[in-house]
């Protein structure tokens, strides 16, 4: 997407940007935490050609059917256009994922974050978004009042909206969505437990959060050897249920095996696993992505596995970071063939 930002609960003109003052930007990581999936296709390749573009796209995304919707007063007539515009801007959920690819024009999707705050997403040609079933959202064109969209469906094309209220809250799709939001995050080695398995979603918060975790772990394990495995992998693509990164899908089993080896050597309570999900839209084509430029992570490609152990003679202090307390012993993109136990 071109941009995303928080907006107030009430807006005067839905077709304006309606940014907060000062502006509060959102991020792909915030959207990913709420279940939103985003991908951008080359706008020069995006079109409504059935055999040349749409059918191959459906196969790639594992969907079965589609339709093309052209929303504008010129196409629908002013009265019908405004009626649909009002309907689309009512906060609602669907019982199926809502998958949209912008072909022409532009518009705004408003979605609720995990704290029930509105985030506005500006979508332009080539932008594809998956709004998960059960998530409250709404849509509007911008002031151009013109957008052409490819709608993608698992089965027959349909658009059934359940406006926010008691009925929507009781739908299985809504309950399942909320359950997923509050469920422990899954990693390559099992569910996050806050003790030996962790997952940190936000790159810019990594150092602060991992420093707290590291200091606590070193205090708890002061009399026992400790190994920390950090696994950087592509985040989950909801259209497949797997990582968007094919190599990460293949590496998942090998990562689990290597971590089991660490557990066998250090003990299950002294082998620690941290998964860092990498959002496709933040990472691809971005040389300044935080994990790429981080002094320790130095991410060159995903997947990447690092194994660290406590640094000798490390001294804790108020401004000491996690990477001052740990030494990198193993760094690999080829998990299957790497010895993770050689930490000397």
UniProtKB/Swiss-Prot annotation:
InterPro entries: ARD, ARD_euk, RmlC-like_jellyroll, RmlC_Cupin_sf, Thioredoxin-like_sf, TXNDC17_dom. It catalyses: 1,2-dihydroxy-5-(methylsulfanyl)pent-1-en-3-one + O2 = 4-methylsulfanyl-2-oxobutanoate + formate + 2 H(+); 1,2-dihydroxy-5-(methylsulfanyl)pent-1-en-3-one + O2 = 3-(methylsulfanyl)propanoate + CO + formate + 2 H(+). Pathway: Amino-acid biosynthesis; L-methionine biosynthesis via salvage pathway; L-methionine from S-methyl-5-thio-alpha-D-ribose 1-phosphate: step 5/6. GO terms for molecular function: acireductone dioxygenase (Ni2+-requiring) activity; acireductone dioxygenase [iron(II)-requiring] activity; iron ion binding; nickel cation binding. Keywords: Amino-acid biosynthesis, Cytoplasm, Dioxygenase, Iron, Metal-binding, Methionine biosynthesis, Nickel, Nucleus, Oxidoreductase. SUPFAM superfamilies: RmlC-like cupins (SSF51182), Thioredoxin-like (SSF52833). Its cofactor is Fe(2+); Ni(2+). It comes from the Eukaryota. Gene3D superfamilies: Glutaredoxin, Jelly Rolls. Fe(2+) binds at residues 92, 94, 98, 137. Binds either 1 Fe or Ni cation per monomer. Iron-binding promotes an acireductone dioxygenase reaction producing 2-keto-4-methylthiobutyrate, while nickel-binding promotes an acireductone dioxygenase reaction producing 3-(methylsulfanyl)propanoate. One of its GO terms (cellular component) is nucleus. It is found in: Cytoplasm; Nucleus. Ni(2+) binds at residues 92, 94, 98, 137. One of its GO terms (biological process) is L-methionine salvage from methylthioadenosine. Its EC number is 1.13.11.54, 1.13.11.53. Belongs to the acireductone dioxygenase (ARD) family. Catalyzes 2 different reactions between oxygen and the acireductone 1,2-dihydroxy-3-keto-5-methylthiopentene (DHK-MTPene) depending upon the metal bound in the active site. Fe-containing acireductone dioxygenase (Fe-ARD) produces formate and 2-keto-4-methylthiobutyrate (KMTB), the alpha-ketoacid precursor of methionine in the methionine recycle pathway. Ni-containing acireductone dioxygenase (Ni-ARD) produces methylthiopropionate, carbon monoxide and formate, and does not lie on the methionine recycle pathway. PANTHER family: ACIREDUCTONE DIOXYGENASE. This is Acireductone dioxygenase. It comes from Leishmania major.
């Amino acid at each position: 997407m071109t941009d995303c930002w928080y907006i107030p609960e009430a807006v005067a003109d839905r077709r304006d940007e309606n940014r907060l003052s000062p502006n509060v930007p959102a991020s792909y990581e915030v959207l990913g935490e709420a279940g939103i999936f985003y991908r951008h296709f080359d706008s020069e390749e995006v079109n409504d050609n059935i055999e040349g573009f749409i059918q191959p796209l459906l196969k790639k995304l594992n969907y079965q059917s589609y339709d093309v919707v052209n929303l504008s007063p010129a196409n629908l007539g002013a009265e019908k256009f405004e009626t649909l515009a009002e309907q689309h801007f009512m906060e609602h959920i669907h019982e199926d994922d809502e998958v949209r690819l912008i072909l022409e024009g532009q518009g705004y999707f408003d979605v609720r974050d995990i704290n029930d705050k509105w985030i506005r997403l500006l979508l332009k040609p080539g932008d594809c978004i998956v709004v998960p079933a059960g998530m409250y959202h709404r849509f509007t064109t911008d002031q151009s009042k013109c957008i052409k969209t490819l709608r993608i469906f698992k089965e027959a094309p349909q658009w059934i909206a359940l406006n926010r209220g008691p009925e929507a809250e009781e739908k299985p799709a809504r309950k399942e969505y909320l359950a997923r939001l509050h469920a422990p995050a899954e990693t390559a080695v099992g569910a996050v437990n806050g003790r030996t398995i962790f997952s940190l979603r936000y790159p810019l918060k990594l150092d602060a959060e991992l420093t707290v975790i590291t200091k606590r772990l070193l205090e708890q394990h002061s009399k026992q050897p400790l190994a920390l495995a950090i696994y950087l992998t592509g985040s989950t693509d909801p259209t497949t249920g797997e990582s968007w990164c094919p190599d990460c899908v293949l590496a998942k089993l090998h990562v689990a095996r290597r971590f089991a080896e660490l557990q066998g050597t250090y003990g299950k309570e002294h082998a620690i696993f941290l998964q860092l999900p990498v959002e496709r839209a933040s990472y691809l084509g971005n040389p300044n992505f935080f994990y790429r430029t981080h002094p320790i992570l130095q991410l060159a490609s995903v997947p990447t596995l690092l194994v660290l152990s406590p640094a000798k003679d490390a001294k804790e202090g108020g401004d000491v970071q996690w990477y001052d307390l740990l030494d990198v012993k193993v760094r690999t993109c080829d998990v299957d063939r790497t010895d993770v136990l050689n930490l000397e």
